[in-house]
Amino acid sequence: MKIILFGPPGVGKGTQAKILSEKHQLAHISTGDMLRSAIKQGTELGLKAKSFIDKGELVPDDVIIGMIEEYVSVQENREQGFILDGFPRTVPQAEALDRLLQKYEIPIDCVISLTADAEEIVARLSGRRIAPSTGKVYHVVYNPPKVEGKCDETGEDLIIREDDKEETIRKRLSIYDQTTAPVLDYYKKKGTAAEVDGTQSIDKVSKEIDEILTSATK
């Protein structure tokens, strides 16, 4: 089974990818993790990616595609199946990915887009608070500390990460709408895309995804 999973930041993509990976024994391919691993290992593509990151530039599509190709070119990896998370983010990336998968005769079984209202995502993410020394995550509504603004374990002041500030979240959502949302239309035209409401409970979202996959792989 080969799945592409995407959706805006804060929609619960990582959680669902982990559930799918464990339930169906699929590899979870996160392009972000791939990049970090390649840079850490000092591979040719990793060094190339680092040169762009160090200049504050986006890593070019051909570098990301190259990393995905390194993975899918291994027959065992193709046979296991995978969930592609965080890629493609633009239509040109989707087209490049199509060419790569056609080269290795890999059909995508399903493209799942998790959706959520912008205000729901802002509420989810802007409510997060972090304990600086341990990285423990709290939420002012869903998982509040016993004492407001203080870590239960260390007593230190909780902080708001830059990524969790409302202005940053809205900017990320705007970028997503402009670049990634058209990717859903691209896959809809191919008849492989399905949308799932990501604001439901984790179990409900997981159940809906399973129903879609069962139908797609009949």
From Swiss-Prot:
GO biological process, one term: AMP salvage
Domain remark in the UniProt entry: Consists of three domains, a large central CORE domain and two small peripheral domains, NMPbind and LID, which undergo movements during catalysis. The LID domain closes over the site of phosphoryl transfer upon ATP binding. Assembling and dissambling the active center during each catalytic cycle provides an effective means to prevent ATP hydrolysis.
Enzyme's top EC category: transferase
Listed pathway(s): Purine metabolism; AMP biosynthesis via salvage pathway; AMP from ADP: step 1/1
Catalyzed reactions: AMP + ATP = 2 ADP
Chain positions covered by the region annotation NMP: 30-59
Protein role: Catalyzes the reversible transfer of the terminal phosphate group between ATP and AMP. Plays an important role in cellular energy homeostasis and in adenine nucleotide metabolism.
Gene Ontology MF: a single term: ATP binding
Protein name: Adenylate kinase
Predominant subcellular localization, coarse grouping: cytoplasm
E.C. numbers: 2.7.4.3
NCBIfam families listed in its UniProt record: adk, PRK00279.1-2, PRK00279.1-3, PRK14527.1
Subunit structure: Monomer.
Keyword Kinase belongs to the record: yes
Region listing for LID, in residue ranges: 127-164
Organism: Chloroherpeton thalassium (strain ATCC 35110 / GB-78)
Binding residues for ATP: 10-15, 128, 137-138, 200
Similarity remark: Belongs to the adenylate kinase family.
Residues reported to bind AMP: 31, 36, 57-59, 86-89, 93, 161, 172
